[in-house]
Every structure is written in structure tokens, then in C-alpha cells.
């Protein structure tokens, strides 16, 4: 009986491991990803984030402020040659330039990426997904000074009915003023995001806690060595009604 139990347990463990491996999107397990990117997978949870977004082959996706291109490569492979990824970046000659997306788009195998200016973005087909990670708070910086209702309504206008916006960001304490908190800590109160997005017409459609860290005191700037890479983060999904 004991041997049968051990055999059954080993078989079940093997099957679970196989299922877990199979559940990892090919875009994440792609051997062509840089080692510097895969080293961040443990904290950025790309497989879980892809599943949360619902991104699939053939989708038209807008990635707002792609930074170093960590998700840019993954998204490009996830949507495949029948999809298209638009990477919206700041002025390449400005202080906030993000050259990584253009460099990736020039590499073989990433021909489905088009780099566009964040303002104005120009013409593009209606989108299935808009994604921004660790950047929504930046739109509240006092030096940026944008009308968030206009921004969010702009996203609404370029999204297909039933399309989604995924926002991942560093959480601030409840009630934190958005501009001051963005300036000092580069964080945002998740409730502010919900309020702004629903005011633009979106419906809150779900959240993921895979990036949460309740041990984060929420009082240090995200670049502080004591918390960098370990901040409490929220992932929200908003849907445009059909």
C-alpha cells in the first residue's frame, strides 16, 4: 500500500509539474529573451500577467511607456505575426527618452512592433488591449501636468468595445494625493486609478494580487534600496463596455 501511495504521489507531482510548465506562455519561455529580462521574471510574474490581460495571437496592443522593453519582447511574441504592437514612447530627444523599444523593433523577429510618439500617437486600428506598467503614476507628476480625464477618455476612444486596459503600478497609502505622491514616491493610491478610469467610462473588470507585498510600508520612494524591486504593486483590468 505504501509503495502504491508513493508511486501515485510521484505521478501526480509529475503531472502537476508538466501542467505548470505547459501553462507558461511560449512568449515567456522564448529562449531568445535576454538573460537580463528572464532574471526579473521571479518578481515581475510575466506568465501570470499575460494570463490576466487575456492577450492572444492576432491582438492589436498598445504598450504605453515601455521603458527598457521587458514586456515589449513578450507581447510581440504573444500576439505573433497576425497581431501588432504599438509602443508609445516620449520624445527620443527629450530627458525621458526610451530608446529600447525602437532597438527591439529593429531586431529580426520583431517586425510586428511599431514605435509611436506618446503624444500625438497618430492613426492606428482599434485596439484589443492597452497596457501600462509602473507608469500610470508618472502621468500625475507635477512637471507632466496632463488632464487625466482627457487621457483616459482618449484611451477609451481607441479601444475596441469589450477591449481592456491593464494598469500595473506601485501602490501608495490609501488617501494619498496623486500629484504629491507621484512626485515624492513614484506611487499612486489604487483607488485613484479606479476613480479616474471609471470616470472615463471604463468598467472595473478585475485585479491580480500576484505582485502584492503587504510588508511594504508604502512610505519610501520606489527607488529606495530597502524596497526597490519589492514594492507592493497592484494590477487592475478595466473593460470598455460592448
Q: Where do the PLM segments sit?
A:
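Class I SAM-dependent methyltransferase Rossmann-like catalytic core
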Residues: 24-52, 56
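Conserved class I S-adenosyl-L-methionine
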Residues: 57-67
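A short acidic, Gly/Pro-enriched loop at the edge of an enzyme's catalytic core
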Residues: 59, 121-131
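A short glycine-rich, Lys/Arg-flanked "PGG" loop and its adjoining helix->strand segment in the class I
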Residues: 76-77, 146-161
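A short SAM/SAH-binding and catalytic strip from SAM-dependent methyltransferases
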Residues: 127-149
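Conserved beta-strand signature within the Rossmann-like core of class I S-adenosyl-L-methionine
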Residues: 162-170
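Conserved Class I S-adenosyl-L-methionine
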Residues: 177-205
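Core SAM-dependent methyltransferase catalytic element
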Residues: 215-242
Amino acid at each position: 500500500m505504501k509503495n502504491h501511495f508513493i508511486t501515485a504521489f510521484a505521478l501526480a507531482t509529475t503531472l502537476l509539474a508538466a501542467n505548470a510548465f505547459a501553462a507558461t506562455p511560449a512568449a515567456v519561455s522564448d529562449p531568445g529573451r535576454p538573460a537580463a529580462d528572464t532574471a526579473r521574471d521571479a518578481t515581475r510574474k510575466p506568465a501570470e500577467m499575460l494570463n490576466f490581460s487575456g492577450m492572444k495571437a492576432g491582438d492589436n496592443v498598445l504598450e504605453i511607456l515601455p521603458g527598457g522593453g521587458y514586456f515589449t519582447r513578450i507581447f510581440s511574441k504573444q500576439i505573433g505575426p497576425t497581431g501588432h504592437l504599438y509602443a508609445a514612447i516620449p520624445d527620443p530627444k527629450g530627458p525621458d527618452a526610451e530608446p529600447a523599444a525602437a532597438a527591439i523593433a529593429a531586431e529580426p523577429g520583431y517586425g510586428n512592433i511599431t514605435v509611436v510618439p506618446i503624444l500625438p500617437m497618430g492613426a492606428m486600428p482599434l485596439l484589443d488591449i492597452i497596457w501600462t506598467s509602473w507608469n500610470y503614476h508618472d502621468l500625475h507628476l507635477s512637471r507632466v501636468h496632463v488632464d487625466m480625464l482627457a487621457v483616459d477618455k482618449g484611451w477609451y476612444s481607441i479601444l475596441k468595445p469589450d477591449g481592456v486596459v491593464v494598469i500595473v503600478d506601485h501602490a501608495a497609502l490609501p488617501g494619498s494625493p496623486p500629484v504629491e505622491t507621484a512626485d515624492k514616491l513614484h506611487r499612486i493610491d489604487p483607488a485613484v486609478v479606479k476613480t479616474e478610469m471609471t470616470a472615463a467610462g471604463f468598467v472595473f473588470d478585475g485585479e491580480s494580487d500576484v505582485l502584492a507585498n503587504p510588508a511594504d510600508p508604502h512610505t519610501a520612494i520606489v527607488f529606495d534600496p530597502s524596497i526597490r524591486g519589492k514594492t507592493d504593486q497592484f494590477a487592475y483590468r478595466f473593460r470598455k463596455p460592448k
